[in-house]
């Protein structure tokens, strides 16, 4: 008679991996934005007053959007942490039900 397969998870490892991927994604995103800023910086010196003002208005929108995305990534990382805690707790409760 074959034993039933056991389904098990390492909740800490799953949480760590997902949160690490979120952190890596945020770092790549912010590095790309910084690279873009450094490439645009020399051009800004050549722009007329109107062009500079137009760029500044758009750059402010980009900055706000980037900040919002970074906040979303932070919230996502926190949700992953809390979700992993919730799943681990549910698993312990389920295991406890069999111990009765």
Swiss-Prot record:
Domain of life: Bacteria
GO CC terms in record: extracellular region
InterPro entries in the cross-refs: ESAT-6-like_sf, T7SS_ESAT-6-like
UniProt keywords, alphabetically: Secreted, Virulence
Cell compartments where the protein resides: Secreted
Major localization class: secreted
Pfam families cross-referenced by the UniProt entry: WXG100 (PF06013)
Quaternary data: Forms a tight 1:1 complex with EsxU. Complex formation results in induction of alpha-helical conformation and stability against chemical denaturation.
Family: Belongs to the WXG100 family. ESAT-6 subfamily.
Miscellaneous notes: Elicits strong humoral responses. Induces significant lymphocyte proliferation and up-regulates the induction of TNF-alpha and IL-6 in tuberculosis patients.
Function statement: Induces apoptosis of host cells via activation of NF-kappa-B.
Name by which UniProt lists this protein: ESAT-6-like protein EsxT
Organism listed in the record: Mycobacterium tuberculosis (strain ATCC 25618 / H37Rv)
Name of the gene: esxT
